[in-house]
Amino acid sequence: MRSGLLSNKAKIDPWAFIRVKDERSTLLASLNSILPVIHKGVIAYNDCTDGSDEIIERFCRDNPGFKPFKYPYSVEPAGSIKYETRELKEENTLAGYYNAVLQKIPKNVWIIKIDVDQIYFPKILEHSFYLPRTINDVVSYSRLNMIRDSNNDLKVVGYVRPGDHWLVFNKDLYFVNVCGRDEKGNFYSYEQIKLKRKEPSFKPECSSIHFPFEKNIESLWGLQNL
């Protein structure tokens, strides 16, 4: 690789960057959906109470390119006001967790963030692995949000590209905690990856179907709340 340039025909072979907490309902289906095109990665988990940890350990035994990582701390979720009051230890923050997972992946390799409440289209993922031309390029993925209504029928509720699902080169990467208030005064807090390039280089079309409320089945009743 000279001056960060990639061969025009180079296909990236990324490591999966995965974090899990109580996502049994979609976990195995999500992991199986990436297997045709992603063969290695780190699957981190913490505070699992629904058996997700057992699924992960078994999946990694069956697919030895994937490594399990039990994060030994509780993590405050996105949106918590505790990020503003700064009463959290670093290891209990999202950025602390993400940085710990990142340390388990080799440097100077490509990584793709995988969320296990999504079912992926492997052919679209594979196409995206040919897109980057330099190690500074960033691929940003979009997804189709779906929800179950009170009749247990699936409904499409949005097509989004939120910027939190990416393919990047693991050089000088790290995460920070971000918090503040929007124009309406609503509080927000989340983790943010720090990249050299501010805008995505490539934006392939829908790479996955996202089931954002499968963790909490009670929240599936009520499309009007979206």
Regions found by a protein language model. Give the residues of each.
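Short, acidic, metal-binding catalytic loop of nucleotide-sugar glycosyltransferases
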Residues: 30-44, 48, 58-59
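Conserved catalytic core of nucleotide-sugar-dependent glycosyltransferases
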Residues: 102-103, 122-197
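N-proximal low-complexity "stem/linker" segments adjacent to membrane-targeting elements
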Residues: 1-32
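A short acidic, amphipathic alpha-helical/loop segment
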Residues: 29-33, 55, 126-128
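C-terminal catalytic/acceptor-binding lobe
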Residues: 9, 181-226
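Active-site-proximal specificity loops/subdomain of glycosyltransferases
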Residues: 2-11, 51-110
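Short beta-strand-to-loop acidic/aromatic patch adjacent to the donor-nucleotide binding site
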Residues: 108-119
